[in-house]
Amino acid sequence: HNIVFSNSNYEQMARCTFDLIYDYNPLFVINVGGCNPIADLCNNITTVCCMPCINKPALSTSSIYIRYFPYTEDDDRIYNDLLLNYQHVYDMPFVEELSGSNGCIQVKSDYGIDEDKFAIIIAGNRLDKEIRQRFIQLLNDISSPEDNVVFVFIGDCPLLKNTLKDCDFYNKCVFTGAVSNFKGAVSIGDLFLNPPRQGGSTGAYYAIECGIPVLTLPSCDVASVGNAFTCHTIDEMSDIIHRYMHDSEYMNQQIQNCRSSFKKICSCKDNLPSITSFISKLKEYMNNGGR
């Protein structure tokens, strides 16, 4: 089923969705993303597992959280500190799109970009809300001394596009809009630049798979690709990017870090055993009276 919600029919569709799940009487429900009142209502009829797409627990009344990304001991402690007493977290590493992505690799000329340009990828579905003035200033700082740079915005962002029209570097911007081959679009880049935000990890994983270094703050979800791709503050990013552009030895080292980081991430992504293990733990939890 693919149920389409809108502001005009939300209550009606919510009731239909709940009734549909009730009639199916499933063993459990997985809520991808979190912050879903319909999924929370389903806690009254079955076990609901919340799988956030960020590295922190999303707001949910579910008793089970599913975590699918790599984490450190400190990450685990912080994650569990944010849970309520009745909530538990189970790991289910599952990033099938990394190894099984069907998108073909693309080139810069597919988007009207000269192949000798240094393409900085900025990707996401919420760029209109995520790009703040400080990040725009960063783009200006990057572009001011560089004639050879181009910023490639992947995803619909009409408000951001309108805002950047008044910026001196607007002629160095390319807006792809929504793309059917996300990995292919990311693959044209020389660097994946992550604005301060939650989410964005899929694009970063695609980047390192393609040997494209990532630059992000350590507090962002994208930092899960590895410490080699983080910096402490946004003020450092401009100098680091200029180093990527002009220090080939540094760039080559970071490309090697992409390969080792991607190999490490994918080494634990054997999906079937991961899913089987999660189901076994969930059934044990439910057999012991949990919901």
Placement of each model-derived feature along the sequence:
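Acidic donor-binding loop of glycosyltransferase active sites
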Residues: Y24-F28, S187-G200, I212
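A charged, aromatic-enriched C-terminal amphipathic alpha-helix characteristic of glycosyltransferases
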Residues: H246-N287
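Catalytic binding pocket for nucleotide-activated donors in carbohydrate/polymer assembly enzymes
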Residues: I78, P195-K263
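Active-site and donor-binding regions of nucleotide-sugar-utilizing enzymes
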Residues: H1-L59
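Conserved active-site histidine-acidic residue motif and adjacent donor-binding/catalytic loop
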Residues: S8-M13, C157-L159, C173-V186, G199-G200
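Short acidic alpha-helix that forms the nucleotide-activated donor recognition element
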Residues: F18-D19, D23-Y24, A178-D190, E209
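Conserved catalytic-core segment of nucleotide-activated headgroup transferases in glycan assembly
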Residues: E73, L84-D166, F175
